[in-house]
Amino acid sequence: MTRDKKYYICSNCANISNKWSGQCFDCGVWGSIVEEIINTNKSIIKGSKQTFDKLSCNVSEQLRIPTPICELNRVLGGGLVLGSAILIGGEPGIGKSTLLLQLTASNFESEMRCLYITGEESLDQIKLRAIRLNITNYNTAILAATNLEDIIASIDDNNNNIDLVVIDSIQTITTKELSSPPGTVSQIRTCANELVNYSKQNNIIILLSCHVTKDGQIAGPKILEHLVDTVLYFEGDHNNHFRILRSYKNRFGGVGEIGVFEMSNSGIIEVTNHSELFLIKREHNVVGTSIFAGIEGSRPLLMEVQALIVPSNMVTPRRSAVGWDANRLSMILAVLSSRIGLNLANYEIYLSIAGGLKIADPASDLAVAASLISAATSIPLPEHSVFFGEISLSGEIRKTAKAETRIKEAVKLGFNKVICSKLENLTYDFIFPCAHLQELKEIIK
């Protein structure tokens, strides 16, 4: 007789305990313990011998298949790899399903046989969305199913005719082996594990769409990200028309690469002039505004940094940062006060990265400092200038990685003044190297 036992599993770290608690004892997260029913009547099956292979470099490049979406190829490291499992997460309505449907209906250079499986929509709804997106490739197979065994059986029935499988989404898939509802930790873990193993054994590419939590993390157990080969996040603000696809894990390419897309009525469109998308053309510079020459992955990207400083009557003036680390803003303010005498203790300070972008590059310190100095002194920054450089606690400006790539992107977009840390082997007339914040202050004056 089958024996089912209740366990309590942390939805954050998948730690299993015998009783419920408000906080996970393993990872410390509150409110993450959920009840699961696990079948304990499983017999141990003896394994069989496997054949060893040797590590060699004669793998065919045909294993990587470029997609018709160039921005997606950049993020993936050149294209889709046969037998790989890819997880793509994002907020509801951000465009995950639209991107995946456009991908499956694209015309690949090498003939790709694609299957789009939905657990959230009916077949008629998928067809209506395809009409809205002007998709004319009607050879794409679609299937509405939520049962794992049915999905694998359907793929097996057409195994020789399927190269790419999209499942939208993994939270809706369930297996008959478990009695727990869809979206629970055990269901997600078991179904994802079976699908990943199936893709490896049959050399099929599987793309899994995934929900995210209110904190922007992949919904479900953390092991889900460990199972797959690639983890992508589709980022963006519903109030803005652009979207960014970013890689957080990639066994076949670089991590941190981004692809820039634009959301339109006819679907998702690639953006090639990505830097121009986030910049506003002005005849004269505005007080408190600077341009940061950044790097996202291997891609140079120019971004606008805006600062606003106003007097405050509060005991503790407000410090707000949108798209930038608030703790790092406090550090830059302390360095400006200590090293160049710019005391802003009685002022409210607002910092924003234009376009809803988020910057984690330490080289953005110099652009932020320039915007703050400009806003505090009401002096516009030099026209057609860009900034990059990391600021230390001593006020020194440290060297920055990929400086030449940043400079080339700035020059290409018409900027003729680069204010940055001191560089080696780069001595152009338009480069103004700074060793300390005091030199930056003199340039702004």
UniProtKB/Swiss-Prot annotation:
SMART domains assigned to the protein according to its UniProt record, in alphabetical order: AAA (SM00382)
GO CC terms: cytosol
The keyword Hydrolase appears for this protein: yes
Zn finger region (C4-type): 10-27
Enzyme class (EC, first level): hydrolase
GO biological process: recombinational repair
Pfam families, sorted: ATPase, ChlI, Zn_ribbon_LapB
InterPro entries tied to this protein: AAA+_ATPase (IPR003593), DNA_repair_RadA (IPR004504), KaiC-like_dom (IPR014774), P-loop_NTPase (IPR027417), RecA_ATP-bd (IPR020588), Ribosomal_Su5_D2-typ_SF (IPR020568), Ribsml_uS5_D2-typ_fold_subgr (IPR014721), Rubredoxin_2 (IPR041166)
Region (Lon-protease-like), start-end ranges: 348-445
PROSITE patterns: RECA_2 (PS50162)
Sequence motif RadA KNRFG motif, location on chain: 249-253
Chain positions recorded as ATP binding sites: G90, E91, P92, G93, I94, G95, K96, S97
E.C. number: 3.6.4.-
Family statement: Belongs to the RecA family. RadA subfamily.
Protein name: DNA repair protein RadA
Protein source organism: Rickettsia prowazekii (strain Madrid E)
Originating gene: radA
